[in-house]
Amino acid sequence: MKPSTNRMLTRIKSVYMFIQEKGLVTTQELVDEFGITPRTIQRDLNVLAYNDLVHSPSRGKWETTRKKVKITS
């Protein structure tokens, strides 16, 4: 796996775990927490949403779904 792909997957996993820990979060909170651009956060959230791991109950807010996930390192 390419280093850039590995870095992206690690970041997406971190974003998911942050949302799971905090409950409902805003896109801006994620930008502030991870120090990356809003567009990058949006891409990461789209990957998570596509896999039914997060959803947006209202514009700019995100929470995890009830789907069970096994997190590995």
Swiss-Prot record:
SMART domains: HTH_DEOR. GO terms for molecular function: DNA binding; DNA-binding transcription factor activity. Residues 25-44 bind DNA. SUPFAM superfamilies: Winged helix' DNA-binding domain (SSF46785). The keyword Zinc does not apply. Keywords: DNA-binding, Repressor, Transcription, Transcription regulation. Induction: By disulfide stress. Gene3D superfamilies: Winged helix-like DNA-binding domain superfamily/Winged helix DNA-binding domain (1.10.10.10). Residues 8-63 form the HTH deoR-type domain. The keyword DNA-binding applies. This is Uncharacterized HTH-type transcriptional regulator YtzE. It comes from Bacillus subtilis (strain 168). The gene is ytzE.
